[in-house]
């Protein structure tokens, strides 16, 4: 039996997780390393849908970052720690926007009216943060004279393109880590209810394996949420929340119920 489960791939786990909760009873018998590997796979997919597709599409659309900087970014230069630019710029990259407006000596998120994640450049500073529902969340603000040397312009920025690609990879990995944290947090929340159900059905499941069922049960709802985000919220977020909440409870409940009348996994993975 152990040899049979050792042949289960991450693709097999994904297929079962999204389409066959009745077979979750087999997934809870896998080694912990396989479930961890599955979480990393899902984090990669979620990040690719939410971030990777947008970035790749953007880079292809502009003909590469070098072409973008050379031909599409307004001519700019930094002198005496102050930014001078030919025109205002608003550039969407994935789910983020690079905004430049030198009409503001020191720009703030309050100067921007549209929701989104921003890297905003004023004449003397750069601000990073998010605007959501009229509320601003500032991550950091820095003076330009601490980031760039005098004379920095489009040509110098173009020479730094390789560093931008490295930064994109680092951002991807960071977002993957964030997706893993999100999966763990949601699974912990749902496991509170699922644990009660598992006890009521006399499944013999330990808390760790209930948590594992929740991880698998959340896979499809999280994928759907990411796809909706990629499609610029084709379905309103409030409606999508209700849909995925109902779907998650359904998948998890059926996954817990699949263990009724079966031998509980001999070992807890947590």
Where are the predicted features?
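Juxtamembrane inter-helical linkers in multi-pass membrane proteins
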Residues: 11-18, 196, 200-201, 267-269
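Long, solvent-exposed extracytoplasmic domains/loops
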Residues: 63-157
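Short, highly charged low-complexity linear segments
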Residues: 52-56, 76-81, 246-259
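Juxtamembrane/disordered regions of integral membrane proteins
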Residues: 61-64, 91, 165, 255
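Hydrophobic alpha-helical transmembrane segments
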Residues: 33-54, 109-114, 119, 163-180
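Internal alpha-helical transmembrane segments
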Residues: 2-66
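Low-complexity, intrinsically disordered extramembrane tails and loops of integral membrane proteins
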Residues: 1-10, 262-270
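Hydrophobic alpha-helical transmembrane segments and adjacent short intramembrane/lumenal linkers
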Residues: 152-264
């Amino acid at each position: 039996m152990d040899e049979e489960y050792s042949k289960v791939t991450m693709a097999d786990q994904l297929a079962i997780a999204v389409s066959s909760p009745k077979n979750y009873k087999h997934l809870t018998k896998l080694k912990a390393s396989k479930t961890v590997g599955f979480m990393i796979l899902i984090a990669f997919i979620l990040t690719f849908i939410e971030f990777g597709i947008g970035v790749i599409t953007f880079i292809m659309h502009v003909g590469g970052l070098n072409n973008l900087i050379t031909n599409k970014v307004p001519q700019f230069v930094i002198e005496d720690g102050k930014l001078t630019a030919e025109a205002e710029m608003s550039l969407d990259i994935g789910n983020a926007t690079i905004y430049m407006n030198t009409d503001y000596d020191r720009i703030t998120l309050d100067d921007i009216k549209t929701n989104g994640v921003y890297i905003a450049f004023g004449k003397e500073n750069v601000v990073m943060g998010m605007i959501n529902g009229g509320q601003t969340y500032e991550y950091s603000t820095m003076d330009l004279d601490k980031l760039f040397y005098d004379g920095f312009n489009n040509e110098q920025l173009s020479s730094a393109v390789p560093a931008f690609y490295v930064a994109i990879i680092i951002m991807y990995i960071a977002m993957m880590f964030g997706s893993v944290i999100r999966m763990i947090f949601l699974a912990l929340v749902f496991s509170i209810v699922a644990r009660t159900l598992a006890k009521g059905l006399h499944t013999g499941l330990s808390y760790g394996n209930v948590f594992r069922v929740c991880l698998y049960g959340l896979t499809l709802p999280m994928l759907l949420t990411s796809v909706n985000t990629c499609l610029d919220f084709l379905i309103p977020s409030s409606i999508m929340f209700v849909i995925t909440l109902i779907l998650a409870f359904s998948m998890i409940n059926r996954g817990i119920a699949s263990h009724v009348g079966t031998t509980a996994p001999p070992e807890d993975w947590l």
